[in-house]
């Protein structure tokens, strides 16, 4: 992996792939210099205790661009003020409206000043213990161009790593090339059944107070709660990788952990 990453990093730094977010220069336009194209930034390491220390891909080279990726796929977890349905009594995106947005804002400034956030560089300098790349630490990967999407999949595969990521854009025709790579992010068990029927593996948001470890969808598909949530002291995404959509598996359930979860729990205690 190290030899390949060094070779690929050298190529990325020498070649200007116009319009592709995987270059060192992060070109913003297509070869015709007309259509703005969604970019992405890649980091080698992570302090996220749930995922483990793995390379990560952040969608958007600006905060506005990242939020736009969520608007483009119609993500309901985006705050109402930003064009989604989140906030109030509805679930709210942890990444775009929690602490990850601050880290992303810092990265955007560094990228504008020339810091190398290419995927090859992230893989080259990633931990040797990393077994996966997290695709979509913020933003939605389905908003990326087909060319960038193919590059990401091929680069991760050639590095011998698993790809783990999610998209709310699974119902879009333009996201079909991500089937078998990304998990379909679903908001209900019924949606999970729909995603599976269309060839996706599914992940689903569960109520914030969900306690059961295993349930079934209306169509009878098994749903298990994310092992890294159940046993955070011993399980990380890096050593679990059940969300590698290239491998058959159950629906993965995630109890709501958005910014409003603490308030909901407090309200629940008050009403008891």
Range-by-range predicted roles:
Residues 7-11, 23:
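Intrinsically disordered, low-complexity segments enriched in serine/proline and basic residues
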Residues 11-16, 32:
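Intrinsically disordered, low-complexity polyampholyte segments enriched for Lys and acidic residues
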Residues 21-22, 35:
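Intrinsic disorder/low-complexity segments enriched in small, polar and charged residues
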Residues 29-272:
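Class I S-adenosyl-L-methionine
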């Amino acid at each position: 992996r190290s030899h390949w990453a060094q070779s690929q990093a050298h190529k990325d730094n020498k070649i200007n792939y116009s319009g592709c977010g995987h270059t060192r220069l992060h070109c913003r336009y297509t070869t015709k210099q007309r259509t703005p194209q969604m970019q992405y930034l890649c980091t080698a390491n992570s302090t996220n205790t749930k995922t483990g220390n793995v390379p990560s891909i952040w969608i958007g080279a600006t905060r506005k661009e990242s939020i736009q990726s969520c608007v483009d796929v119609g993500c309901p977890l985006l705050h109402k003020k930003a064009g989604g349905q989140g906030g109030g009594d509805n679930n709210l995106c942890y990444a775009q409206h929690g602490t990850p947005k601050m880290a992303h804002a810092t990265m955007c400034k560094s990228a504008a000043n020339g810091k190398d956030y290419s995927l090859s560089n992230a893989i080259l300098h990633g931990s040797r213990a990393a077994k996966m790349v997290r695709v979509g630490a913020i933003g939605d990967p389905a908003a990326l161009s087909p060319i960038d999407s193919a590059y990401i999949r091929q680069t991760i595969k050639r590095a011998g790593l698993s790809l783990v990521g999610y998209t709310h854009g699974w119902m879009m025709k333009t996201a079909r090339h991500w089937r078998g790579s990304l998990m379909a992010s679903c908001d209900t068990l019924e949606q999970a059944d729909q995603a599976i029927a269309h060839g996706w593996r599914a992940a689903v948001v569960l109520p914030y107070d969900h306690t059961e470890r295993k349930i079934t969808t209306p169509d009878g598909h098994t749903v298990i709660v994310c092992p890294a949530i159940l046993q955070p002291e011993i399980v990380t995404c890096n050593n679990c990788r059940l969300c590698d959509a290239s491998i058959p598996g159950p629906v993965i359930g995630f109890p709501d952990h958005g910014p409003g979860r603490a308030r909901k729990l407090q309200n629940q205690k008050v009403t008891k």
